[in-house]
């Protein structure tokens, strides 16, 4: 008699963040079903957990329209090949991790062949291009969402969605150790500290750094002992920031860090940052913040017409109100930014209330996401 086939899960991750999620999911599934088989497109972390890589994740990690066009034939070939091979393999469940432009079409192809599909990490359909929700609904049996308002959005369109909490909320403590973070960064315990995070993309750093530095200069008038830390994602961004600083504030002392954004947030009394995942991380670090963002005028005009939400930062979207100041475009200028940061650095009622709300929101999205994702995969496999 033939051996029963082990549970087989196909996965496709297209970037580093997806590799981290995939590895966590595989680990949680292996703890319950040790002989489960995992195949697909995987990064080094997923492969270390035992995922058999038919293609390396780097093949899909392409940024920018020009780069995508240059690699389009190869990407279409990979998607067609995966459609065929997964169709022959008949996995119990297919999990597309993020990379929506690649994965949602692949999920649709597989669902048509009777393979159960999950899309892990909702694209920002609630914010813009909302009609994508119908394509997602046709392509997937289930969406796994990090944030509760994402589930509420899918529910409106009767697209099956499960809120599993956010892996970053699981990874970060409810009460971070500010003193230990300062020790790691060499910041004295008895001074005020401001973190500047002008973004991870070159265009953001170019657009925001000068105003962020001028803001810190204004705050130093009120707080002469203010320490300023600037975590930068890589050597390229550091070089870029150093050039802008030399032009804008050559005499100003700032501590530039290679990475270490999380420590910088935990160590600081307040942060000024570009929007994006950094705002969520800053909330989880319990660091009061102001979001400042500027883009090219036409891009901003277009964004205002396309974006359907009242807020741009995740803390405000989670709170359903303006919990943190969002100063965008013309409002993103040093005088206005400094005035918004002043009460946060004063360490009074405003920053205390923000800290308490951040803690409550952290608890709301801290749900053991890896385990929840594994539950969802196994439940769908049994259906």
From Swiss-Prot:
GO terms for cellular component: membrane. The keyword Glycosyltransferase applies. Coiled coil: none annotated. It catalyses: 2-N,3-O-bis[(3R)-3-hydroxytetradecanoyl]-alpha-D-glucosaminyl 1-phosphate + UDP-2-N,3-O-bis[(3R)-3-hydroxytetradecanoyl]-alpha-D-glucosamine = lipid A disaccharide (E. coli) + UDP + H(+); a lipid X + a UDP-2-N,3-O-bis[(3R)-3-hydroxyacyl]-alpha-D-glucosamine = a lipid A disaccharide + UDP + H(+). Keywords: Glycosyltransferase, Lipid A biosynthesis, Lipid biosynthesis, Lipid metabolism, Transferase. GO terms for molecular function: lipid-A-disaccharide synthase activity; phospholipid binding. NCBIfam families: lpxB (TIGR00215). Belongs to the LpxB family. Condensation of UDP-2,3-diacylglucosamine and 2,3-diacylglucosamine-1-phosphate to form lipid A disaccharide, a precursor of lipid A, a phosphorylated glycolipid that anchors the lipopolysaccharide to the outer membrane of the cell. This is Lipid-A-disaccharide synthase. The gene is lpxB.
